Swiss-Prot record:
This is ATP synthase subunit gamma, mitochondrial. It comes from the Eukaryota. Mitochondrial membrane ATP synthase (F(1)F(0) ATP synthase or Complex V) produces ATP from ADP in the presence of a proton gradient across the membrane which is generated by electron transport complexes of the respiratory chain. F-type ATPases consist of two structural domains, F(1) - containing the extramembraneous catalytic core, and F(0) - containing the membrane proton channel, linked together by a central stalk and a peripheral stalk. During catalysis, ATP synthesis in the catalytic domain of F(1) is coupled via a rotary mechanism of the central stalk subunits to proton translocation. Keywords: ATP synthesis, CF(1), Hydrogen ion transport, Ion transport, Membrane, Mitochondrion, Mitochondrion inner membrane, Transit peptide, Transport. PROSITE patterns: ATPASE_GAMMA (PS00153). GO terms for cellular component: mitochondrial inner membrane; mitochondrion; proton-transporting ATP synthase complex. The gene is ATPsyngamma. One of its GO terms (molecular function) is proton-transporting ATP synthase activity, rotational mechanism. NCBIfam families: ATPsyn_F1gamma. It is a peripheral membrane protein.
Length: 297
């Protein structure tokens, strides 16, 4: 009686096992197919973003060539006047972080934030940060939120203009923070595949007025110094924003190109896995058919 029951249940158990294996194989194929479709869609997005970044990079590079005289002229003014911070005054430092509101561009914004974190670690109590772009604020606010003086948003969606730089320079001067020295921290464009995190010195109006080389001009009053200081600060910010925009677009273009290549490699691996899994399912089904036919004969 037990043998008869075993003989009756064994085919049912084998059939249930084969059915479960078949369903598991089909479920695996469906999961691979869904993932493959998702990766292909991501690759289309990254390829499109690469093309957009390439077009924006070409324009940013042209704009940078036109903006460099602004930065060079302002730098020469500070170099030739040999302005030095007042050692007797209480040391107060201002750091202007030039980034943007947009991501997906490698370590462009992280490099600027890393350099500023190093400055803050040395003298946190006497250092304030003016963030140009929301990315620098997001990174620095985790540890040094109280040191952020002000944030300029809506940066990076459109190419920076001198009007944008003038507004930022005016906000810097209107903050009421009487700094003795400062730096503009930005990314200096070198080539399509490289950039360097650099700094440019800036000084307050009181520090500039105390320069010995400027003191020889009798007609140089505080209003003239203030006007030129506003223009030179706007010129430096404009120049650094153009350098940062060009570095950002080239880095985003490279990042999207790498992402597209990685997606292509993943598509190849998933396609191979899909074909192997499908072949295994087909082979298993053929074995089941042949085994069933052999059992009937």
């Amino acid at each position: 009686m037990m043998m008869q029951r075993t003989q009756l249940l064994l085919p049912l158990a084998m059939e249930a096992t084969m059915l479960a294996q078949q369903q598991r194989g089909m479920a695996t194929l469906k999961m691979i197919s869904i993932r493959l479709k998702s990766v292909k869609n991501i690759q289309k997005i990254t390829q499109s973003m690469k093309m957009v970044s390439a077009a924006k990079y070409a324009r940013a590079e042209r704009d940078l060539k036109a903006a460099r005289p602004y930065g060079i002229g302002a730098q020469q003014f500070f170099e030739k006047t040999e302005i030095q911070p007042d050692e007797k005054a209480e040391p107060k430092k201002l750091l202007i972080a030039v980034t943007s509101d947009r991501g997906l561009c490698g370590a462009v914004h992280t490099g600027v934030a890393r350099l500023i974190r190093g400055e803050l670690a040395q003298d946190e109590a006497n250092t304030k940060v003016f963030c140009v772009g929301d990315k620098s604020r997001a990174i620095l606010s985790r540890l040094y939120g109280k040191n952020i003086l002000m944030v300029a948003n809506e940066v990076g969606r459109l190419p920076p203009t001198f009007l944008d730089a003038s507004k930022i320079a005016n906000e810097v001067l209107q903050t009421g923070y009487d700094y003795t020295e400062g730096k503009i921290v930005y990314n200096r464009f070198k080539s399509v595949v490289s950039y360097q995190c650099s700094t440019l010195p800036i000084f307050s109006g009181s520090t500039v007025e105390k320069s010995e080389k400027l003191a020889v001009y009798d007609s140089l009053d505080s209003d003239v110094v203030k006007s030129y200081l506003e223009f030179s600060l706007a010129s430096l910010i404009f120049y650094t924003m153009k350098e940062g925009a060009c570095s950002e677009q080239s880095s985003r273009m490279t990042a999207m190109d790498n992402a597209s290549k990685n997606a292509g490699e993943m598509i190849d691996k998933l396609t191979l896995t899909f074909n192997r899994t499908r072949q295994a399912v087909i082979t298993r089904e053929l074995i089941e058919i042949i085994s069933g036919a052999a059992a009937l004969t």
